[in-house]
């Protein structure tokens, strides 16, 4: 028997589009006196409703007319699922019975695609205009500057709502592509979605207390393995869950069990955080609090980011205040993908609420072969054969910054306003590509697969808490001048290029309570992909809107760009970050973090100005020497134009100046002004200066003016 009511025919909705206007829906949830669809009421968001309310919506849906599913088709596709969930999901039963603590906020594809990344502002600024006559190019039924766009995500070719699909599963690919399959199988990509019973790190006990916590486990309070479809994540950073209705777990249950529908459903307290549970112990929190008095010390200090358990954060939620009601089709599946072998949507709906049935019909889970190569890949009958998707689908999440669009650079090229998707004050997970987009490396053609093997993305044990990707090309393969200097230094001889140029900066958890970007911590578990270090005493990588508080709760933080439009790293993140998951920190005595460093106290850096002073001790002598050598070479070059020397002496002068010029070229190509190897760089420049002085002495002692 069907447990859901079918949606009113879509054609009827098109005719009645104006009737579902966001301002006419009755609800108790209001904002500025207006109803807010989906906030405490069983309605989809106004972003989706606006799509449906457009009188010309049928002109924008390509699937029926062209056989191709485009952005708005994906958004409309979710309607029937939401009808089912509004009628059947436990959230609404708890709410109806007064056993819900916190307000649910519906989040659908309309919100995620059209609102995420401030895509609305992008749509407004993106004017499709014919340059010859000034008229708008009409390839959609929207007015110029109003056409919906998605900036935060790239759509996958197929969704969990597409039935039937042609997915065959990674094991089928592995029958012929053994090397690629084995590499993938041991990577974290293969572990992003796991069923209960697939967790060796806790002996398959999802309620086992983790690390030194009293009772904090992978699954939150009131959530049992038999009530979920899968967990999301690995021991590297965090664990979340997807419930039996394929809805993101943004809640926990107090004094009861979700599977029984007992107790009280509470917003947040839903995501296990390894960094908090294992490293950020009460003792470490107290240590940080001494230096940063506003750092959370007690459970209540974590505010809406925290919960009732040490190590269990609130993600996609504000503890006891509000939480997203968000199906996996709206969010999770974009990057933490899975697919079913159901042949019809009726089979799919009949299985919702029954996790065992959903698991039985799962044909693919994790970032599998077919997510990039297409369903069925190159096989006869498949729809792949090329690369329907790539890394950037999940790793190039942008955020549109309107202020940047209004700059001269943004007026010339609108993509200048494409900034990095943020989680509060830190770059979000999945922004490696959007960080790289604003870099000289990207402009030169570097892409993810330049350095990474997409099949083997994890180096070492996937159960480790350290972020260490597998690399197929090292920085020094291209940066030979830097390699030459770095191999001759003792200062950072055990460090890699990434130690300074790719600090852990990104947030997976949006753990706002522990984000202190000016102190380069502490919710930073993903490596940055900016590379360029800005040696400046004041300029910061991460900034709120001008004139606003630098508190992490301030809205609108962005990644700074330099005069060339490139992102850059400030000295605090480069030298003194604090990160328990950054192997370049943990394997090198904590670098210069005042909270992790094992170096002498004088090398524990507390602020950017202090670091700048230390760097200047390296760079100033190098720059001074460089200037002397360059000036000497220029003087000799001019003298040789007017001075005649014996052949043997001229040869000697030219050989000496060539050797000095080689040093100049090396230092210029290196570009660090001694930071990569201060003693060695200064030693080479000392030698170059000697060459110049010797050449000058030869001219002074043997030459005469050719014009005399």
Swiss-Prot record:
Residues 1-22 form the signal peptide. Heme c 6 binds at residues 441, 475, 478-479. Its cofactor is Cu(+); heme c. It is found in: Periplasm. Its main location: periplasm. Heme c 7 binds at residues 497, 500-501, 676. GO terms for molecular function: cuprous ion binding; heme binding; iron ion binding; oxidoreductase activity; oxidoreductase activity, acting on a sulfur group of donors; sulfite reductase activity. It catalyses: [protein]-disulfide + hydrogen sulfide + 2 A + 3 H2O = [protein]-dithiol + sulfite + 2 AH2 + H(+). One of its GO terms (cellular component) is periplasmic space. Cu(+) binds at residues 429, 508. Exposure to oxygen reduces copper binding and leads to the formation of a disulfide bond between the two Cys residues that bind the copper ion. Binds 8 heme c groups covalently per monomer. Heme c 8 binds at residues 492, 575, 591-592. Its EC number is 1.8.99.-. Disruption phenotype: Loss of growth based on sulfite respiration. The keyword Transmembrane helix does not apply. Heme c 2 binds at residues 332, 335-336. Pathway: Sulfur metabolism; sulfite reduction. Keywords: Copper, Electron transport, Heme, Iron, Metal-binding, Oxidoreductase, Periplasm, Signal, Sulfate respiration, Transport. One of its GO terms (biological process) is anaerobic respiration. Substrate binds at residues 238, 315, 397. Respiratory sulfite reductase that catalyzes the reduction of sulfite to sulfide in a single step, consuming six electrons in the process. Required for sulfite respiration under anaerobic growth conditions. Does not contribute to nitrite reduction. Belongs to the multiheme cytochrome c family. The eighth heme binding site has an unusual CXXXXXCH motif. Homotrimer. HAMAP family: Sulfite_red. This is Dissimilatory sulfite reductase SirA. It comes from Shewanella oneidensis (strain ATCC 700550 / JCM 31522 / CIP 106686 / LMG 19005 / NCIMB 14063 / MR-1). The gene is sirA.
